[in-house]
Curated annotation (Swiss-Prot):
GO biological process, one term: glycine betaine biosynthetic process from choline
Lineage, opening ranks: Bacteria, Pseudomonadati, Pseudomonadota, Gammaproteobacteria, Enterobacterales
Reactions catalysed according to its record: choline + A = betaine aldehyde + AH2; betaine aldehyde + NAD(+) + H2O = glycine betaine + NADH + 2 H(+)
UniProt keywords, alphabetically: FAD, Flavoprotein, NAD, Oxidoreductase
EC class name: oxidoreductase
Binding site for FAD: 4-33
KW NAD (keyword) present: yes
Active site: H473 (proton acceptor)
Organism name: Klebsiella pneumoniae (strain 342)
Molecular function GO terms recorded: betaine-aldehyde dehydrogenase (NAD+) activity; choline dehydrogenase activity; flavin adenine dinucleotide binding
Protein name (Swiss-Prot/TrEMBL): Oxygen-dependent choline dehydrogenase
Superkingdom assignment: Bacteria
HAMAP family: Choline_dehydrogen
Length: 554
């Protein structure tokens, strides 16, 4: 089999590339996905409110675990990643958050990455998006990704939480993806007007599936990239239960879009990485590139949970006898509780003046429950997810076996810097202050977790060690740049090699301030133009907020 391009991974970036590259009818593309189809009648992936379900099994989730995390009481922590058409956009929380403009401007300070500034990237965010309330300078109106903005009249706890943030002295913002991210306001979500999850399989691949120049292979587990000297010439994979490898040739390029955990694994299995690691597994070294799998970053978060004195939380929706009605409303009308991910309000703040842009993120949820659906509180409650955004801690992803079925060694080194501890102590104390504002007086009962007895630095630190969880935002393991630990250049081309690029969240030099999916899609759109040899979209001229010396709160 011969194709112009072979794309490894049908996730948030891979599906963008597959769709855009096959717009050229003379360009042939093979899209390889280790998981299965995105079954449209499976409520677990299609109903926004059911977002916890895909994380509980292994049909749609790689269900990785970390090595024992040394600063987290040696816990092995979850590292869920999407498996199936859509990748992690098939199982994520559907929060549409782009990050802060300053994140991208910070990337662009590095020589060679100047074209990754916010104003260079904003046109690609807009190109990808159709926002239900219409386009403007910041939002698109005819892109493949459906974005829904929360409407007035939703759960009263959302507005109360936003108002509480404002009463605590922080700004209100009408659009966390617009002029000003900093502050509290409604949180957009990737949900269609029919109340379905807007994964990239639905938004992008649905346009492209019927094209004769696109071949999609599911249950196709990539073993390695085939090199002739320093040039990538093809891919070898295992299909279904077969132990006999399948092969295809790439006439132009191999595009690695397997995500921050799998992309470095595939490079390492292909002979690209740290030679000392590769020799442990008798892998012939194609290219010495020590940064492959290093620079691993993530967002860590905690839940602060409260009893709700008014019966307005989603607790009744957790009772089995209420779920048939909720399911029917969603299935036949695309409406009701089932049509929302329930993360409809949130915010970004600076915990201290030393931070030039927000370093803490909030998600508000009108029920007290773990993200993966476990440990639901057996009463009306609500919670605030809070976590730091740009931890200096760095980890790695490293092979443990040549077997493509084997999971790698994943270590984030969560909380390995004093800044991490300072930020999380500040976050808990600020959150308690917000939760004690008048806007929440009629709703706020006792603090369920951590509990009011948890006050000192030592007590807060122990709570974080035992209870903080991943926000499922790994990135950075094939970082873009030109220093000795960079893996790809500003166009995604792997340093020292020909015919192979990485296009996914692994190329982010530094993690962004917010959820990763929207920016990963943007990366796919921007790289698609580069791969096609097109001129970049004209830079935006939109204004954006820079705090400068502004106080962190009134």
């Amino acid at each position: 089999m011969q194709f112009d391009y072979i794309i490894i991974g049908a996730g948030s970036a891979g599906n963008v590339l597959a769709t855009r590259l096959t717009e050229d009818p003379n360009t042939t593309v093979l899209l390889l996905e280790a998981g299965g189809p995105d079954y449209r009648f499976d409520f677990r992936t299609q109903m926004p409110a059911a977002l916890a379900y895909p994380l509980q099994g292994k049909r749609y989730n790689w269900a990785y675990e970390t090595e024992p995390e040394p600063y987290m009481n040696h816990r092995r922590m979850e590292c869920g990643r999407g498996k199936g058409l859509g990748g992690s956009s098939l199982i994520n929380g559907m929060c549409y958050i782009r990050g802060n403009a300053m994140d991208l401007d910070n990337w662009a300070k590095e020589p060679g990455l100047e074209h990754w500034s916010y104003l260079d990237c904003l046109p690609y965010y807009r190109k990808a998006e159709t926002r239900d309330i219409g386009p403007n300078d910041y939002h698109g109106g005819d892109g493949p990704v459906s974005v829904t903005t929360p409407k007035p009249g939703n759960n009263p706890l959302f507005e109360a939480m936003v108002t509480a943030g404002v009463q605590a002295g922080y700004p209100r913002t009408d659009d966390l993806n617009g002029y000003q991210q900093e502050g509290f306001g409604p949180m957009d979500r990737t949900v269609t007007p029919q109340g379905r999850r807007a994964s990239t399989a639905r938004g992008y691949l649905d346009q492209a599936r019927g094209r004769p120049n696109l071949t999609i292979r599911t249950h196709a587990l990539t073993d390695h990239i085939i090199f002739a000297g320093k040039r990538a010439v093809g891919v070898e994979w295992l299909e279904g239960e077969s132990t006999i490898p399948s092969k295809a040739t790439a006439n132009k390029e191999v595009l690695l879009c397997a995500g921050a955990i799998a992309s470095p694994q595939i490079l390492q299995r292909s002979g690209v990485g740290n030679p000392e690691l590769l020799r442990q597994f008798d892998i012939p070294v194609v290219h010495d590139l020590p940064g492959v799998g290093e620079n691993l970053q993530d967002h860590l978060e905690m839940y602060l949970q409260y009893e709700c004195k008014e019966p307005v939380s989603l607790y009744p929706a957790l009772q089995w006898w209420n779920q048939p009605k909720i399911g029917a409303e969603w299935l036949f009308g695309g409406t009701g509780i089932g049509a929302s991910n329930q993360f409809e309000a949130g915010g970004f703040i600076r915990s201290r003046a030393e931070f030039a842009w927000p370093n803490i993120q909030y998600h508000f949820l009108p029920v007290a429950i773990n993200y993966n659906g476990s440990n639901a509180v057996k009463e009306h409650g609500f919670q605030c997810h809070v976590g730091s955004m740009r931890s200096p801690s760095r980890g790695h992803v490293r092979l443990k076996s040549r077997d493509p079925h084997a999971h790698p060694a994943i270590l984030f080194n969560y909380m390995s810097h004093e800044q991490d501890w300072q930020e999380f102590r500040d976050a808990i104390r600020i959150t308690r202050e917000i939760m004690n504002q008048p806007a929440l007086d009629k709703y706020r009962g006792r603090e369920i977790s951590p509990g009011t007895e948890c006050q000192s630095d030592a007590e807060l630190d122990e709570f974080v060690r035992n209870h903080a969880e991943t926000a499922f935002h790994p990135c950075g393991t094939c970082k873009m740049g030109y220093d000795e630990m960079a893996v790809v250049d500003g166009e995604g081309r792997v340093h020292g090699l020909e015919g192979v690029r990485v296009v996914d969240a692994s190329i982010m030099p530094q993690i962004i301030t917010g959820n990763l999916n929207a920016t990963t899609i943007m990366i796919g759109e921007k790289m698609a133009d580069a791969i096609r040899g097109r001129q970049p979209l004209p830079r935006s001229t939109a204004a954006y907020y820079v705090a400068g010396g502004a106080p962190v709160r009134r």
